[in-house]
Amino acid sequence: LPSPAKVYIQTNFPGEKTSFVAKDDDLAFAEYTVIMMNGTKLEFSHSGALSKISSSDGIPAELIPESIREYVQRHYPGAGFVEFDIDRRTYEVKLTNRMELKFNNNFHLIAVDD
């Protein structure tokens, strides 16, 4: 794993062990998949930047950008996060209530899917 990915895991999952790590070389740039012992799945870009995190048990809210957390708390009280997907232009979250929200780089809501 690239250094930034290792640091992300050590910082956000202290003491948690990995059960699976894979490098996908089939793309123009390698991508990495990490599955933690608690079932959380993380995906990282070739540079080690987080691109996706998912867990059926829920993702700790502190791993989600504050603006998105606040929006969800305000509009979907009680909903948790089960997936967070990052790409160059958007952030997408899937909630425990099955709502899917897409935000632009300025954290403005641009799409909702239920």
Predicted regions and their residues:
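Interaction-mediating elements
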Residues: 1-114
